[in-house]
């Protein structure tokens, strides 16, 4: 069986293999989207296909949507060439339940894949056509937090952004320049309204997207590429809206075991590929079932019936912000960042296996969420923080079939310690005067810095997960030797007092010395990490 339009015509074979096929006419909904696009998405990797593509697929099944999605890739064109084209834009969703069972479903909601490549005239002109269409209601984005960035930490432009500003809309390369160039096309085609919906996992994502688009437009105005009318068009949120969202679904890399299992069921060519740009992707996506997408209901050109989608909630901006803060600062992400790097240093590959087999790590994870997070979280109303955390610990975190690794959870932690730890620490300072009553969060911070030494609890070396601050932090810690606590003096002070990192000086918050003491205990020698965690979570 081939995952192609011709291949899925053999319904009996697919159903016999236990794989559900679309109940709607895939060719018809794809054709309708090509003629009259309604929903475009930028960043067409794993989370998009299984979550956003899955929502659209569900709406098509219900008759709540009448056409597919237009998929646009701005970064890694191999994804369009290797994962979309050979499979006629079909995807295969593999939902992994905690009892080991799986749901297989072919997704037919992805109508067309376009490469946002200004040097490819045919693709670029197609993108212009799509953005000029009055029927277009929304453009959604999963391009990662980095996709919105125009400037380095020192405030200077990234070189590709500098080139985009200089070369103008016709030669745009970066995602923000491509988007702004396409908005200029839409402006010239009749100033049609549009909603631009960031679905990336970062705080106030809509504001971040808006800032980047306005910056690009202003720079092009200065360079003479666009006029004042265009600036007014993109600045008016009644015409071009930037709704905020909160997104949540654990989507690990595609599993080679699942690829082999699918091929054993008779589905051909399921092996994952690693592109030249290091995207790890396959014709299928494996993910957990639970999902949450809270969207600010601000759509000046109308919208599909998104609220009918599985796990989708429409709300106002304040509610979206509270839901996002609940997830990112309290419930889910702090647990990942506090325990994932420690898990690497303790030698646990899988996050779920660690929690299921190490009572102290489970206790620490629960302390982060229940004991230290929930007391200072604001209730968003549409989702109960208590119920959200209960589901995490009862169903989501223990699911070993997800295959989520501690190393994945250690990626880019330096970029997240402010929002994931700092916000809760600040809330304690506001409520109690200082944060000295906290234990699990300081333990997580100490554990992250202990992980940065790249030597595990048995004394073996390992490679760190990618993080833009790896070199800088390792340089600061280079004289510290595991097994020789006397080599640790004041090396952590510049890190723990850095308000750019933690959003607060941890010493002024009353936890800096506590982190230092925990770190000192963790470097005593073999087994010291395990002993330190045991001591503090059972105190």
Per-region residue spans from a language model:
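Substrate/ligand-engaging "lid" and interaction regions
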Residues: 1-539
């Amino acid at each position: 069986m081939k995952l192609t339009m011709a291949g899925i015509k053999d319904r009996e074979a697919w159903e016999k293999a236990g794989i559900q096929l679309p109940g709607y006419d895939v060719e018809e909904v794809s054709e309708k989207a090509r003629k009259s696009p309604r929903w475009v998405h930028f960043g067409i990797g794993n989370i998009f296909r299984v979550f956003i593509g899955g929502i659209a697929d569900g709406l098509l099944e219900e008759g709540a949507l009448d056409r597919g999605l237009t998929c646009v890739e701005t970064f890694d064109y191999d994804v369009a060439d290797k994962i979309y084209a050979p499979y006629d834009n079909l995807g295969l969703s593999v939902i992994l339940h905690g009892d080991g069972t799986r749901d297989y479903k072919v997704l037919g909601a992805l109508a067309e894949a376009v490469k946002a490549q200004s040097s490819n005239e045919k693709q670029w002109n197609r993108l212009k056509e799509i953005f000029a269409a009055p029927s277009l209601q929304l453009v959604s984005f999963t391009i990662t937090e980095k996709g919105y960035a125009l400037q380095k930490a020192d405030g200077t432009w990234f070189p590709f952004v500098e080139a985009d500003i200089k070369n103008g809309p016709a030669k745009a390369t970066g995602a923000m320049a491509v988007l702004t160039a396409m908005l200029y096309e839409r402006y010239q085609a009749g100033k049609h309204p549009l909603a631009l919906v960031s679905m990336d996992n970062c705080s106030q994502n809509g504001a971040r997207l808006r800032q980047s688009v306005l910056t690009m437009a202003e720079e092009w105005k200065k360079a003479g590429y666009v006029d004042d009318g265009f600036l007014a068009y993109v600045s008016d949120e009644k015409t071009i809206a930037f709704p905020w969202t909160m997104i949540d679904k654990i989507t690990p890399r595609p599993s080679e075991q699942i690829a082999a299992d699918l091929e054993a069921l008779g589905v051909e060519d399921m092996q994952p590929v690693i592109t030249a740009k290091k995207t790890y992707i396959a014709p299928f996506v494996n993910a957990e079932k639970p999902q949450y997408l809270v969207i600010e209901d601000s759509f000046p050109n109308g919208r599909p019936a998104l609220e009918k989608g599985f796990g989708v909630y429409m709300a106002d901006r304040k509610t979206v912000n509270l839901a996002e803060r609940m997830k990112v600062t309290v419930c889910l992400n702090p647990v990942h960042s506090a325990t994932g790097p420690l898990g690497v240093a303790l030698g646990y590959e899988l996050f779920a296996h660690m929690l299921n087999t190490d009572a102290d790590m489970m206790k620490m994870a629960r302390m982060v969420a229940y004991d230290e997070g929930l007391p200072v979280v604001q209730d968003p109303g549409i989702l109960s923080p208590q119920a959200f955390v209960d589901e995490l610990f009862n169903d989501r975190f223990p699911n070993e079939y997800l295959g989520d690794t501690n190393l994945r959870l250690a990626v880019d932690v330096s970029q997240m310690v402010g929002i994931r730890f700092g916000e809760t620490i600040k809330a304690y300072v506001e409520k109690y005067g200082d944060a000295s009553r906290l234990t699990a969060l300081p333990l997580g911070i100490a554990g992250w810095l202990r992980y940065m030494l790249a030597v595990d609890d048995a004394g073996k070396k390992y490679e760190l997960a990618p993080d833009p601050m790896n070199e800088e932090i390792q340089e600061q810690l280079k004289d510290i030797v595991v097994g020789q606590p006397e080599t640790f003096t004041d090396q952590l002070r510049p890190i723990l007092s850095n308000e750019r990192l933690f959003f607060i000086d941890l010493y002024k918050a009353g936890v800096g010395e506590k982190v230092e003491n925990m770190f000192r205990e963790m470097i005593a020698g073999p087994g010291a990490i395990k002993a330190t965690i045991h001591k503090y979570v059972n105190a």
